[in-house]
């Protein structure tokens, strides 16, 4: 019996080792793919003049069905001092043509065109390219309220300047366009977190919040200096979890609003 158990244990150990090796190989291959896509990416030049207050990252991969609504919501912002970095992740539909149309109409729209390498790699290249003091995120099937950037930047500038605001965050709606248009408020930001600026390590409730990375602004200098990045895994699933956790353990000052600013599509 002991010999059989030992044999089973050895077999199990070998299987686990093979699985671990396979996983490491897949990660290495994905990282190599992301690095190659980054190296060959084509980035449109920034317009002359001072850097914008906000850089909004729009990660795009075969998103033509909803992309115009997303970009229209950016173009209609009441706060105008921003650049929109449209990161085309190897789209094979009409997404690239849509981006180019917006670039022709509005110099605030810029293109980062790269081979497909996943959501995380797209976001990190956007962070590296961004020039704004703060970075926002708009996914291509969602859309902002017209005052979204104005509200978030107002939170930043309305706080005392002794310590810079690292994160400004607001609420959002779940959104359905079919069979009938409707919104459902999702209250991530609520008292006591909305009462005053806070350090996330002092308010543990923030670590249990849904990681809605696209209803916020992040201070670019914090992300760059502290190495806060997205995981460059394949596809577009759950990269926001790791990013949000790293933001909370890094940020020194967070401000929140109970107002909702973004429609997060559920029928895509």
Question: Residue spans of the language-model regions?
Answer:
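Short Lys/Arg-rich cationic patches that frequently serve as NLS/NoLS or arginine-rich RNA/DNA-binding motifs
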Residues: 1-40
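Nucleotide-sugar donor-binding/catalytic module of glycosyltransferases
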Residues: 27-268
